[in-house]
Amino acid sequence: MEKIKVSISWSGDNYCANAQGDYLNGIIAATHKTLEGVKQEFQSALQFHIEGCLEDGDKFPEWITDDNYELEYITEVSALLHSLDGILTRSSIARVSGINERQIGHYASGHRTPRPQQREKIINGIHKISRDLAMVM
């Protein structure tokens, strides 16, 4: 089964999902206030795009027209951090990741994009917090 990679980020007031590639005949994008909502909106936008292109006579690979694909969501740090607002504090993420809290704020707002090493530190820190919470009985 083929995969369509969908990038999800946070921008201003919404989550943004987009995918592009020659096999899609363009760019598909969607926005929503919630992470689950943007995934649903993206699926709807993708179906709308495919149906419209087929009506116009555009060609797609067989795996797309046969619905033989799955969406692989790649959550950018901005969307990940924003989705955790109200659950984890930025100071706790900063403490376990070793990254300055102000820098975490820049990543959460989408004003800055972390290098791959910084992204890994943030994700490892979030995993550490979740393991610590799972030990509470």
Predicted regions and their residues:
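Short, charged, surface-exposed hinge/linker loops at domain edges
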Residues: K3, S44-R102, H106-A108, R112-R119, ...
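Residue cluster at the C-terminal edge of the helix-turn-helix DNA-binding motif
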Residues: G125, I129-D132
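DNA-contacting interfaces and partner/effector-binding or oligomerization modules
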Residues: M1-D58, E62
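Proteins with a high burden of low-complexity, intrinsically disordered sequence enriched in S/T/G/P/A and R
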Residues: A19-Q20, G86-L88, K128
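Hydrophobic micro-packing sites on short alpha-helices
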Residues: V38, R119-I123
